[in-house]
């Protein structure tokens, strides 16, 4: 007998079946669902997606659809009874608000009611006029009525738009042109793979760009693309160095440019390089490697040069690829970037590390069109950057081991070589070799300009006589800079440094020292005094150096304590004052240090803390920096002696001594732990026993005399402070910092009439530190 599960059950014949309409789907028996239903493959765009809402970021969902992955393809399967409910009829009328975006057309933009989104409504209604083909049935009268209502509403809106356009004046036409420009900006951005929404945002800035007068840049024979990019940077007119050097560089001459700090030397060589790259793109010149090489003495300056050139290129429809090659970062990533780089900016050490082992890369760099040496006097200082000379030799096809005779022969051959198409551009604020001599020794004048530039001519290969452009031959200091000097003892510099910072609160300050150890000591000292102090020196990791610069730029009251690694080229906005904790070793260092403030048309101050043993170097510094300035200047002294309030300094001394003791103790403990770890590891490697107590006795017994004996005894004493003693010192310092410094106010008879109590209360609410009046630094304005 056949099992019951395999028997076929026939439907009961109750009567003749009614005739089914074509538009009514055939009802399927629930008992047939055990078999597979017929499913069809549908494209994702043809499905009727339903929007969840704006709260979910515009998420759309659909029901009754199976998703099947076939290899790399994704298919959407819809069952037969749900085809019509989940699939959008392509011939159905598309409403303007629901029609998908198909990109901008080539026709002119028709401006309508912007708030209601009716721009280009004629194109939106083009699809709705198509006749409906096979969609006929019971719902036909209802759909026809909806279509008639939509056409009526559309005609009314078009009539309203026409009335609005007829009533607009010239201002409306100008707005229309701006919208057209914005749409064109979107098309340009999309063609080059940029951010479309960023282009839409840029369309709102056309009015601001039209207000910028760029007539001063037009006379420099620059392309409209470059002028437009400069306009986006809001540079109204070129600086003196830019106005004189850009035409010479564009004409193909080698240039040596000298200008004061903060005068725009970066764009003076950056604009011609980008201009040349645009010309090569228009001419269809095939890329054979990097077009330009820029050498920088420090990592921070190299990064800044790259940021400035990238900002210039951001305003171009097509821009060169700028690559920064510095130490402290991944060398593999930099090697990959060099494969596609057009403009390379690097420091000599890392750049030579990349070039030295790659002959193919050296051959590509030998074909560069521009060689730019920024801060050339620092790069080619005798005995400083051996890698810079090796890089120049590699560009000329020489190996580092070539002797002098082979170099002379190659120089004679290169003079007859017509393929030497490389332009050499040299920029700095100081080319006088006399400024590089040490202030502590006796230096002789190096003579005229020809003798001063002779050392550069030996290092660099110019195609001929370079154009020497000096825009400020009289003064090498910025016009808005005021210079001052504070006389103090060698052991009182910490006190007077803190006094200057307190007398000038709310200023972004840059403190320069001559040693890394001073940076490591001053940073915790000022931090203990509740000041935002940040370190910067060459032994820090590169990411830590970037972090210090970013924090210094972000905070208005921050203090950056740095060595001369931050003296050249750094363009930090709104640096109010520069303090020289040590007198610089050379005059050119003082010029570049002071150039971190008073950049461009802004003002700033530069103050030297001068100890008695530094008086002679300070006099030589003043004579070298300001000797050429004529007597027609109004100021009697270029470096003014500041009569700082000694009473305020004496009242601040207790808190400075406490902070210094805490900082020295922490540094001594860290140093002892580091030395102990090193000696213990060395003893383990040698296989001998290490006894720290015996070593301490030896070190303590050798303190009778000799150099550094007193310092070692102080470190030994600071090392022995216990944790409880450190806590007591910190509590005492907190108590000192919580009180305001009294500068002569009678606390016992405060209502006697001689004290402005209201002013004291207001100063206390604003964070004032003193009780009484202070004269500041005493600059003669």
Curated annotation (Swiss-Prot):
Residues spanned by motif DEAD box: 374-377
UniProt main location, coarse: nucleus
Reaction it catalyzes: ATP + H2O = ADP + phosphate + H(+)
Pfam families hit by this protein: DEAD, Helicase_C
Domain Helicase ATP-binding: 246-449
Sequence ranges of Basic and acidic residues compositional bias: 137-154
Sequence segments annotated as region (Disordered): 1-47, 79-196, 394-419, 697-721
EC number of the protein: 3.6.4.13
Location of the Helicase C-terminal domain: 494-643
GO cellular component: nucleolus
PROSITE patterns: DEAD_ATP_HELICASE (PS00039), HELICASE_ATP_BIND_1 (PS51192), HELICASE_CTER (PS51194), Q_MOTIF (PS51195)
Keyword Membrane in record: no
Motif Q motif per record, residues: 215-243
Gene3D superfamilies (UniProt xref): P-loop containing nucleotide triphosphate hydrolases
Entry-linked CDD domains: SF2_C_DEAD
InterPro entries: DEAD/DEAH_box_helicase_dom, Helicase_ATP-bd, Helicase_C-like, P-loop_NTPase, RNA-helicase_DEAD-box_CS, RNA_helicase_DEAD_Q_motif
UniProt feature, compositional bias: Basic residues: 1-10, 19-34
Keywords, comma-separated and alphabetical: ATP-binding, Helicase, Hydrolase, Nucleotide-binding, Nucleus, Ribosome biogenesis, RNA-binding, rRNA processing
Top-level taxonomic group: Eukaryota
UniProt-recorded Gene Ontology molecular function terms: ATP binding; ATP hydrolysis activity; RNA binding; RNA helicase activity
Coiled coil: none
Acidic residues bias: start-end ranges: 104-116, 402-419
Function, in words: ATP-binding RNA helicase involved in the biogenesis of 60S ribosomal subunits and is required for the normal formation of 25S and 5.8S rRNAs.
Family: Belongs to the DEAD box helicase family. DDX24/MAK5 subfamily.
Domain writeup: The Q motif is unique to and characteristic of the DEAD box family of RNA helicases and controls ATP binding and hydrolysis.
Protein name stated in the entry: ATP-dependent RNA helicase MAK5
Upper lineage: Eukaryota, Fungi, Dikarya, Ascomycota, Pezizomycotina
């Amino acid at each position: 007998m056949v099992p019951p599960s395999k028997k076929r059950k026939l439907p009961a014949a109750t009567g003749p079946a009614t005739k089914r309409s074509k538009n009514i789907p055939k009802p399927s028996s629930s008992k047939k669902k055990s078999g597979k239903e017929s499913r069809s493959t549908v494209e994702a765009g043809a499905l009727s997606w339903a929007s969840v809402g704006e709260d979910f970021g515009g998420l759309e969902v659909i029901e009754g659809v199976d998703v099947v992955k076939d290899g790399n393809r994704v298919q959407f399967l819809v069952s037969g009874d749900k085809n019509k409910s989940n699939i959008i009829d392509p011939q159905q009328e598309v409403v303007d608000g629901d029609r998908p975006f198909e990109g901008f057309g080539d026709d002119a933009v028709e401006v309508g009611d912007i708030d209601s989104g009716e721009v280009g409504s004629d194109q939106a209604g083009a699809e709705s006029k198509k006749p409906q083909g096979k969609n006929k049935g019971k719902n036909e009268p209802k759909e026809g009525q909806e279509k008639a209502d939509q056409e009526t509403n559309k005609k009314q809106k078009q009539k309203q738009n026409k009335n609005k356009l007829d009533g607009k004046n010239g201002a409306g036409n100008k707005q229309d042109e701006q919208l057209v420009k914005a749409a064109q900006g979107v098309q340009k951005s999309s063609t080059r793979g940029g951010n479309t929404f960023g282009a839409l945002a840029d369309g709102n800035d056309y009015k601001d760009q039209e207000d910028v007068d760029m007539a001063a840049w037009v006379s420099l024979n620059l392309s409209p693309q470059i002028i437009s990019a400069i306009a986006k940077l809001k540079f109204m007119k070129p600086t003196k160095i830019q106005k004189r050097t850009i035409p010479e560089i564009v004409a193909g001459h080698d240039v040596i440019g000298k200008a004061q700090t903060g005068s725009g030397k970066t764009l003076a060589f950056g604009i011609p390089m980008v201009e040349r790259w645009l010309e090569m793109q228009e001419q269809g010149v095939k890329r054979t490697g990097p077009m330009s090489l820029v050498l920088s003495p420090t990592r921070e300056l190299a990064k800044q040069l790259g940021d400035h050139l990238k900002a210039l290129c951001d305003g171009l429809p097509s821009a060169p690829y700028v690559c920064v090659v510095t130490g402290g970062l991944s060398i593999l990533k930099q090697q990959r970037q060099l494969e596609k780089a057009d403009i390379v900016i690097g420091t000599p050490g890392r750049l030579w590390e990349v070039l030295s082992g790659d002959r193919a890369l050296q051959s590509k760099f030998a074909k560069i069109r521009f060689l730019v040496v920024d801060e050339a006097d620092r790069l080619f200082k005798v005995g400083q950057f051996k890698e810079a000379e090796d890089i120049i030799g590699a560009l000329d096809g020489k190996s580092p081991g070539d002797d002098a005779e082979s170099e002379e022969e190659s120089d004679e051959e290169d003079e007859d070589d017509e393929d030497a198409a490389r332009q050499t551009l040299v920029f700095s604020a100081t080319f006088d070799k006399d400024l590089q001599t040490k202030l502590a020794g006796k230096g002789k004048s190096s003579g005229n300009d020809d003798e001063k530039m002779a050392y550069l001519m030996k290092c660099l290969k110019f195609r001929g006589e370079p154009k020497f452009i000096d825009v400020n031959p009289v003064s090498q200091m910025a016009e808005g800079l005021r210079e001052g000097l504070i006389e103090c003892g060698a052991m009182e510099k910490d006190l007077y440094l803190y006094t200057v910072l307190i007398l000038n609160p709310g200023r972004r300050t840059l403190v320069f020292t001559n040693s890394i150890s001073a940076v490591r000591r001053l940073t915790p000292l000022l931090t203990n005094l509740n000041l935002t102090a940040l370190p910067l020196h060459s032994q820090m990791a590169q990411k830590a150096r970037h972090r210090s610069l970013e924090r210094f730029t972000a905070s208005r009251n921050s203090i950056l304590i740095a060595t001369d690694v931050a003296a050249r080229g750094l363009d930090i906005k709104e640096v109010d004052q520069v303090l020289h904790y040590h007198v610089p070793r050379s005059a050119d260092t003082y010029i570049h240090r002071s150039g971190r403030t008073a950049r461009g048309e802004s003002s700033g101050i530069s103050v030297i803390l001068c100890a008695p043993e530094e008086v002679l170097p300070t006099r030589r510094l003043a004579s070298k920096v300001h000797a050429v300035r004529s007597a027609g200047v109004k100021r009697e002294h270029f470096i003014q002696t500041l009569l700082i309030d000694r009473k305020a300094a004496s009242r601040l001394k207790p808190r400075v001594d406490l902070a210094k003791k805490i900082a020295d103790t922490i540094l001594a403990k860290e140093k002892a732990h580091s030395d102990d770890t090193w000696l213990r590891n060395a003893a383990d490697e040698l296989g001998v026993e290490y006894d720290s107590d015996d070593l301490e006795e030896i070190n303590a017994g050798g303190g009778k005399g000799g150099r550094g004996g007193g310092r070692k005894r102080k470190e030994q004493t600071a090392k022995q402070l216990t944790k409880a003693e450190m806590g007591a010192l910190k509590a005492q310092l907190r108590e000192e910092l919580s009180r305001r410094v009294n500068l002569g106010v009678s606390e016992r008879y405060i209502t006697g009439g001689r004290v402005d109590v209201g002013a004291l209360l207001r100063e206390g609410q604003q964070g004032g530190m003193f009780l009484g009046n202070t004269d500041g630094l005493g600059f003669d304005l």
